[in-house]
Structure formats: structure tokens, C-alpha cells
Amino acid sequence: VSDLGGPVVLCFGVVDEADIVKDFLEYHLGLGVEKFVATDVGSTDGTLDILCDYERSGHLHLTRFHDPSVRAENRDWLSAMAYRARDTYRASWCLFCDPDEFWVFPETDAPGYLAAAPSPVVIFPRYNMVPTCANDSGEVADFREFDLVARRPLEFFYDTQMVGKPGGVEALLWDYAPDIIRFVAPKVAARSDVIRAVVPGFHDVVAADPSIVRHRETRGYVGHFQARNAAQFANKARLVADYIAVNPPSVDRHSSRHWVRLAALYNHDMIYQEFARQILSPEEVAARLREGVIERDNRIAARLALIGGGA
């Protein structure tokens, strides 16, 4: 147990992430995370087999549900994970994210950073990891080699009212910059004893003391591997489309425009075109590097190379 008074526990929800979840777990163990609390909401791709290995080793507590279309707040498994981390593992701090998201702490590991945190609630920016080509054939590199980070992402919003209009879905595909360089919402780390509830998306917590001021990290970040390969991307879009069909924005205010758009692209057989747009050409990479929209940062890749590959 660290000098924090208890372990750092990472809480995450998961569905169908077999290609990345072992790397995710090993990476964060290497950063000083000691325990995990996971909620699987219906994986069918081998993810559960991997999670069960870590459950048997004592590193992970696993809760299983079977319908990924049920809204998280209807079962409140988000907050339940925080309570589990506090009550079962006696967590000092909790990190909250998804298994395609990797924490990067400036200059140190998780316990070292959190020991000096100026607030019991810390908001980390989340940046997309930009896919790169492995060779001249245009094939996508293994995600473990990605070293381009959208550190100054573009801020724009999708007009999802276009979905029902003639040519609207095509416009959603082509009339915007690639989604991979768009701003995405942050993630949160919090001391376990201040958490009253967890906000959907793991973007913040409801603190027991409403006067707590959040510290906003500026050097560290959470790297998001949302587009790793075409099959993974299409399956994620299928799950999103299924969720949006059951939970349209009129019912679920947490259904983001990003998800509504992704569901529409999937339902109109445009998802592989959308994936191709996330792979920037060498000319686009050079231009975005000059603009400062993306930066080279191999910290995640270097740690993953030490792990030696996962699933």
C-alpha cells in the first residue's frame, strides 16, 4: 500500500474491449495503481475472460451486467464502483475512465502525483490518440505504437438535427474536420472519502462537500484510443447505435452529439468511411503538427513497449 494511506484504485466500465483491456490493466499497474473495480455491461468478445484472470489474482473486483443499452444511472453502477473501491479496497484515491483510456502523469507515477495533489478532486484533460500508418500500404499501425496526441483539439459541435434531412448524414460525415482531432470531455480522479456520486462519463464527481474546488491538470492527460482498427471501430459504433436506439437524446440527456452522429453513420453504412477519415495523411499530420493541434508524445507507447503487448 502506498504512502497515501490506501491503494490507488482505478474504476472502469467496459464492453467488448478484448484487444486493449490487458494492456490497459498492465499499463496502470505499472503506474502504481494497485486495484481495479470493473463493471462489464455485456461483453461477448473475450473481455470477460481477461477480466476474470485479474479477478482470480486478487487485483480486480468484477460486476457483470448483460445489456449495454441500459443507462448507467438506472443501475448507478458508476457510483457503486466508487463505494466498492472505498469499502472493499480501502482506496485512498480513485481514478475513473474507460479501458481505451490511459493516464499520463507528469514526471511521476499515480501515487507520487496524487500525494502532492492540491485538491481532493482533480480533472485531467482527455486527448485522442491519432492513428498512424504502419507503412506505405496505408495499413494502420498497432495502437501500441501511436505517438500522436491531439493536445490542442478543435472545438466544434455536430448539428445532429441533420440526421433526418436529405443528405444530412453525408454532411455529418464530410462537412467537419476528422473527429479524432475534436475536443473530448475530461476524466476525473478523486479521493475516495469525498465522493458522494460519480457523474456519467466519468467527467467529474459529486463531492460530499460542495465547496471543494477542482484542480485542473495542465501537463498530464488521459490518452484516448478511440480508433484502433476498422473492426474495433465498427463494433464500437454498433454498440453505440444499439444504445441510441433505446436511449435517444429525447430520453437520455447524456446521449452526446458525438454518439448520435456515430450511430447515424453506422446505420447508413458509412462507418468504414468514418474510420478512414481518422487516419491522417502524412500531409495532414505535418499540417496539424505545425498548427499545434497534434503533438508527438511517446510516453504511452514507451510504457506499452515495456509491457510487451497484451491481449
Model-identified regions with their sequence ranges:
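Active-site-proximal specificity loops/subdomain of glycosyltransferases
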Residues: L48-F96
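Catalytic-site signature of metal-activated, phosphate-bearing donor transferases
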Residues: N74-D76, F105-A311
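Ser/Thr-glycine-rich phosphate-binding loops at phosphate-binding pockets of nucleotides
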Residues: F12, T39-T47
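Short acidic donor-binding/metal-coordinating loop in glycosyltransferase active sites
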Residues: V41, A91, D98-F102
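Short beta-strand/loop segment that forms part of the nucleotide-sugar
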Residues: E34-G42, T63-D67
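N-proximal low-complexity "stem/linker" segments adjacent to membrane-targeting elements
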Residues: V1-E26
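Short acidic/polar active-site loop segments enriched in Thr and Asp
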Residues: E34, S92, P120
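Short, acidic, metal-binding catalytic loop of nucleotide-sugar glycosyltransferases
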Residues: E26-K35
